[in-house]
């Protein structure tokens, strides 16, 4: 996999720049079995009150992640000022999201136009973030109309969980499982086959 550097206003961090080549499919994570600095993880989701089923699944994965890293789940209310204009709604959500992103966070934006990565690459993303000098990794899940310009510009990397558009609650559950899977890959544990 080729590694390139993406310039950010305050961080200059490596990230995988392209989808895996056919030769890279089926490979293992380059950090597997190595010591990786465990950054605290914050997931910032734009949305409304979560369903009971989603809350239960998120809580289950919070417990599973505890041995690996600290975890914080933040919910930004969608359309906080009840804007009638879509652009105003996205801007309002963006302001709230940006308040939760620290100046030295390593930011991953989830977007259907983002880079397609596999589970090993997600584990490598956690390893890259841990080696970056950042104090935390923040994953950002946008609202119904996506992310604003500031959030996109702030991203160290933009990935997608699927080629399909996912409801923010489904995206959160998929992300939680992938974070757990990534840590088991990094630790060489029997979960990912």
From Swiss-Prot:
Similarity comment: Belongs to the RNA methyltransferase RlmH family.
UniProt-listed HAMAP family: 23SrRNA_methyltr_H
Keywords: Methyltransferase, S-adenosyl-L-methionine, Transferase
EC identifiers of the protein: 2.1.1.-
GO MF entries: methyltransferase activity
Matching Gene3D superfamilies: 3.40.1280.10
Entry keyword annotation includes Ligase: no
InterPro entries the UniProt entry points to: Alpha/beta_knot_MTases, RlmH-like, tRNA_m1G_MTases_N
Positions contributing to S-adenosyl-L-methionine binding: 110, 142, 161-166
Biological process, per Gene Ontology: methylation; rRNA processing
Protein's name in the database: Putative RNA methyltransferase At5g10620
Naturally occurring in which organism (per UniProt): Arabidopsis thaliana
Keyword Transferase on entry: yes
């Amino acid at each position: 996999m080729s590694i390139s550097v993406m310039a950010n206003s305050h961080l200059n961090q490596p990230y995988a720049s392209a989808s895996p080549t056919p030769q890279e499919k089926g490979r293992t994570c380059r950090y597997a079995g190595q010591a990786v600095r465990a950054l605290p993880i914050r997931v910032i989701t734009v949305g409304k009150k979560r369903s009971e089923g989603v809350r239960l699944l998120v809580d289950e994965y919070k417990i599973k992640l505890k041995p690996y890293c600290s975890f914080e789940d933040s919910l930004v209310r969608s359309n906080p000022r009840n804007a009638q204009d879509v652009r105003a709604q996205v801007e309002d959500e963006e302001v709230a999201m940006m308040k939760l992103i620290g100046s030295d966070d390593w930011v991953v934006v989830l977007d259907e136009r983002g880079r397609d990565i596999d589970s090993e690459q997600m584990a490598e993303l956690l390893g890259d973030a841990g080696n970056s000098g950042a104090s935390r990794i923040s994953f950002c899940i946008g609202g119904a109309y996506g992310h604003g310009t500031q959030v996109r510009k702030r991203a160290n990397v933009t990935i997608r969980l699927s080629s399909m558009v996912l409801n923010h609650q489904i995206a959160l559950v998929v992300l939680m499982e992938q974070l757990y899977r990534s840590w088991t890959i990094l630790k060489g544990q029997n979960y990912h086959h």
